[in-house]
């Protein structure tokens, strides 16, 4: 596993689940990891993000994990308000842009950097109905990953993306799982090659791979960590 001693990491969306597991994994491998959530820093606000970077200093590893459906599930497209749309797009995509823009200058000066964006299987293919903004923002995050990887590779900065499958990582995913009932839960697990749901640690292990020195020739990639669900 990678040795990240001396590296400084910033992880967004760390109140629980995947974000918290990523912080723990980075620290376990030697990095100094700073986790933030919406209660401490609004990562869609350039001023707040700039202030955070000023306090922390140069960032070697950025993990853009902030996001979520913001309670918007099962809405017909005609019922999605402008405010609803922007809330989800800002939380998932704008935050990725704002944080990436903030850390890149120091990464360029250092001649090295690792950026990992946490997208979703919903950004790669059709998912639940009624999550139009979330799926669109996550697809946009994948596009942003590829564009910035192409732009920043010459500076020693890699940009990659992880698309998690079904992970019981927060109250929203737990409620979603419970809403399926026993039959629906069995059907979902049967569509996963490994026949189990994911854990936050599964996603954190993918981040460790992309953050490692050994992954310096891997950039612009989207890694599905979904137990093989995407192959069905």
Could you tell me what each predicted segment is?
Residues 69, 116-140, 145-154, 166-167:
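Catalytic loop of short-chain dehydrogenase/reductase
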Residues 207-208, 219-232:
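Short C-terminal tail/terminal secondary-structure segment
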Residues 100-101, 146:
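A short, exposed helix-loop element centered on a Lys and neighboring polar residues
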Residues 39-51, 82, 201-202:
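The beta1-alpha1 cofactor-binding region of Rossmann-like NAD(H)/NADP(H)-dependent oxidoreductases
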Residues 153, 158, 163, 218-220:
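Short, small/polar-rich loop/turn modules that mediate ligand/substrate recognition or access, typified
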Residues 166-192:
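A glycine/serine/threonine-rich, flexible loop-to-helix segment
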Residues 73-77, 81-89, 177, 188:
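Substrate-binding pocket helix/loop in short-chain dehydrogenase/reductase
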């Amino acid at each position: 596993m990678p040795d990240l001693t001396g590296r400084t990491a910033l992880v967004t969306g760390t109140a629980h689940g995947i974000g918290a597991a990523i912080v723990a994994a980075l620290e376990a491998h030697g990095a100094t990891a700073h986790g933030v959530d919406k209660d401490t820093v609004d990562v869609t606000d350039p001023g707040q993000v700039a202030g955070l970077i000023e306090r922390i200093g140069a960032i070697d590893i950025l993990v853009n994990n902030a996001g979520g459906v913001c309670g918007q599930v099962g809405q017909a497209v005609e019922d999605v308000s402008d405010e609803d749309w922007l809330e989800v797009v800002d939380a998932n995509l704008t935050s990725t842009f704002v944080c990436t823009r903030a850390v890149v200058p120091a990464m360029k000066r250092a001649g090295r950097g690792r950026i990992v964006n946490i997208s979703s299987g919903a950004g790669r293919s059709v998912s639940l109905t009624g999550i139009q903004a979330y799926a669109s923002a996550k697809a946009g995050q994948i596009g942003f990953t590829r564009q910035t990887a192409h732009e920043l590779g010459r500076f020693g900065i890699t940009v990659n993306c992880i698309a998690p499958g079904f992970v019981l990582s927060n109250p929203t995913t737990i409620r979603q799982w419970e809403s399926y009932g026993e039959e629906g839960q069995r059907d979902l697990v049967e569509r996963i090659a490994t026949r189990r749901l994911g854990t936050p640690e599964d996603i954190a292990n993918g981040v460790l791979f992309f953050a490692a020195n050994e992954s310096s020739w891997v950039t612009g990639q989207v890694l599905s960590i979904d137990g093989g669900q995407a192959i069905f």
